[in-house]
């Protein structure tokens, strides 16, 4: 019997293969629920834009037969294919570069930080810093990349 970590790795490898054939990427894989009601959520992404419902459907149709064939779970499972969403998590330098000019929320590490949360536009990505223009004040922030605890896009209304 495989561990959840081993199952996730096996699923990731196959999902990545299927996704790349469809011009997609794997953003995350989550295994949720109890042994009786497993939910496998595959979060897909698209390097050149946003994921559509059609993208999710195409991935699901291409990936589901392999899951049924390999029979990784003891009981039945539900496959959920989704996108990272409009307020997607930003996972580092490559994402900051990709979403340059977009509004994002940065939660910083450390209790000593004057501004533990900064919401602003991603201006420039340097070797070990990111430059942000705060949304409300227009103030420029230089944030060390290693000081970022969490970051995600913000929905601009």
Swiss-Prot record:
- Which branch of life, at top level? Bacteria
Q: Name one Pfam family in it.
A: DUF150_C
Q: Which cysteines share a disulfide bond?
A: none
Name a GO CC annotation attached to this entry.
cytosol
Which keywords annotate this record?
Answer: Cytoplasm, Ribosome biogenesis
Q: What broad class describes the main subcellular location of this protein? A: cytoplasm
Sorted alphabetically, the Gene Ontology BP terms of this entry are: ribosomal small subunit assembly; translation
The UniProt entry, under InterPro entries, shows: Ribosome_maturation_RimP (IPR003728), RimP_C (IPR028998), RimP_C_sf (IPR036847), RimP_N (IPR028989), RimP_N_sf (IPR035956)
Q: Where in the cell is it found?
A: Cytoplasm
Record family assignment:
Belongs to the RimP family.
Q: What does this protein do?
A: Required for maturation of 30S ribosomal subunits.
Q: Which HAMAP family match?
A: RimP
Q: Which PANTHER family match?
A: RIBOSOME MATURATION FACTOR RIMP
Its protein name is Ribosome maturation factor RimP
- Species source reads Petrotoga mobilis (strain DSM 10674 / SJ95)
Organism ancestry: Bacteria, Thermotogati, Thermotogota, Thermotogae, Petrotogales
